């Protein structure tokens, strides 16, 4: 948290920077108000980066466009119907929106757009008080009609008006509360939590895409556990990702098993800790985080208490992969993300067979082949999945995975594991067996791939010999 003086210095530096100062002067000259609003003002006090800038104005969209166009490096009006014009001004990307005074009908997913006449009125209709502050330009006057600055210093999340009215207007704000709790490390006011519990059914009118986008922002925060727990505790998760609260299985004192819900949140935390060190991208990894959160969602459907009292979850990896695919599809995730997450969930138990008894080289090759481009993520997920408090067991599992990674590296040097292919390609198979393209060529290819996985590189001559023997048996 920055001091007021430090935050004001940051805001003044931004307000007096060349593109923003020039923009403000143009709006004033045209007889309109302009203010920096929302996230950038909040983030100046929190010491967070000031990237994309949100501005509010008394000007209508056509006027905004006319004022901005001559000085913008680029501009766009995709949000024009909602009063928003976007522009790039030097190093800054800005969105300039006409003051809003929207209303919401009871069953509608979309607001009835109405433009307002005052900055204060615009701020009071925003989601939370800490987001309802503005800096008037060019005067650099702070406007805080609801007490957002007090909330920032108290690390408290509260709505400008009644939480019930706010969430009734836009139910997505309930998910935003969970996201901000995690993203900004703030405590959600008890009146807001109670309203989330009362109003949770209203989230059903929010489009799947908006829910998805908010869940993604939550998961990509530095510490999403707090926000996810809030969604579960208020009952909102039952409506947006019911597989998560379903993990709160009753723990029988005689049939011991992990608290699957708490375990899943811990796996997510541990995956986040590992991703920075293990994965090449500097950005948070959405696929890994989704897989970590959802890796055990097949357990409720597969829980069995055996005759001796032991609890089992046989095939929860396969069941969980199917459930993840279904949920992520319902939330309108892209096909690539859905495929990657469900595949990681399907593979997440594979290593634990290795920890019991080391595999042959063939088993190691198959592990690499099955993971393919997801191998590094699978390494992270598998390591994160060890949450035992038994230090001896934890050390044994960690050592076993270290050994597996060493074997993968050694075989990779010898055999180019990550680009594993049979010794003959499709063209060679067709030429050798005098075949035309068709299903039998695929069968032959898979036969040679199995040989390659079992034994490593055969060489073309040996591959040709075995292929002829296989083909003779297949067609004879």
Ranges and model annotations:
Residues 1-476:
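Catalytic cores of the polymerase beta-like nucleotidyltransferase superfamily
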């Amino acid at each position: 948290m920055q001091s007021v003086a430090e935050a004001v210095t940051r805001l003044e530096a931004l307000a007096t920077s060349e593109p923003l100062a020039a923009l403000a002067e143009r709006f004033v000259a045209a007889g309109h108000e302009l203010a920096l609003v929302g996230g950038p003002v909040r983030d100046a006090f929190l010491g967070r980066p000031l990237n994309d800038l949100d501005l509010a104005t008394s000007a209508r969209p056509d006027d905004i466009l006319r004022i901005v166009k001559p000085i913008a490096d680029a501009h766009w009006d995709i949000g024009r119907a909602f009063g928003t014009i976007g522009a790039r001004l030097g190093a800054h990307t800005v969105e300039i929106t006409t003051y809003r005074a929207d209303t919401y009908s009871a069953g509608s997913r979309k607001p009835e757009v109405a433009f307002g006449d005052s900055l204060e009125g615009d701020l009071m209709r925003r989601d939370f008080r800490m987001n309802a502050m503005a800096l008037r330009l060019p005067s650099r006057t702070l406007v805080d009609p609801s007490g957002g600055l007090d909330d920032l210093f108290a690390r408290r999340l509260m709505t400008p008006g009644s939480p019930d009215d706010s969430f009734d207007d836009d139910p997505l704000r309930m998910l935003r509360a969970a996201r901000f709790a995690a993203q900004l490390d703030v405590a959600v006011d008890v009146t807001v939590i109670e309203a989330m519990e009362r109003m949770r059914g209203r989230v059903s009118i929010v489009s799947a895409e908006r829910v998805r986008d908010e869940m993604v922002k939550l998961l990509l925060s530095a510490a999403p556990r707090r926000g996810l727990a809030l969604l579960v505790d208020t009952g909102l998760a039952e409506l947006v990702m019911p597989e998560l609260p379903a993990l709160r299985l009753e723990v029988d004192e005689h049939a011991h098993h992990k608290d699957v819900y708490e375990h899943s949140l811990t796996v997510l935390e541990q995956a986040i800790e590992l991703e920075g060190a293990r994965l090449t991208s500097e950005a948070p990894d959405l696929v890994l985080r989704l897989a970590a959160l959802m890796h055990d969602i097949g357990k409720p459907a597969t829980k069995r208490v055996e005759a001796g009292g032991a609890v089992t979850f046989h095939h929860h990896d396969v069941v969980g992969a199917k459930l993840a695919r279904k949920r992520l599809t319902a939330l309108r995730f892209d096909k690539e993300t859905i495929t990657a997450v469900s595949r990681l969930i399907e593979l997440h138990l594979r290593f634990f067979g290795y920890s019991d008894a080391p595999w042959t080289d063939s088993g190691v090759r198959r592990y690499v082949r099955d993971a393919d481009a997801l191998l590094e993520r699978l390494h992270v997920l598998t390591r994160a999945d060890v949450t035992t408090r038994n230090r001896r067991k934890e050390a044994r599992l960690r050592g076993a995975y270290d050994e597996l990674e060493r074997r993968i590296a050694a075989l990779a040097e010898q055999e180019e594991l990550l680009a594993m292919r049979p010794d003959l390609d499709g063209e060679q198979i067709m030429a050798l067996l005098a075949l035309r393209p068709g299903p039998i060529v695929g069968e032959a290819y898979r036969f040679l791939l199995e040989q390659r996985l079992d034994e490593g590189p055969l060489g073309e001559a040996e591959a040709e010999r075995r292929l002829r023997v296989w083909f003779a048996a297949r067609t004879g």
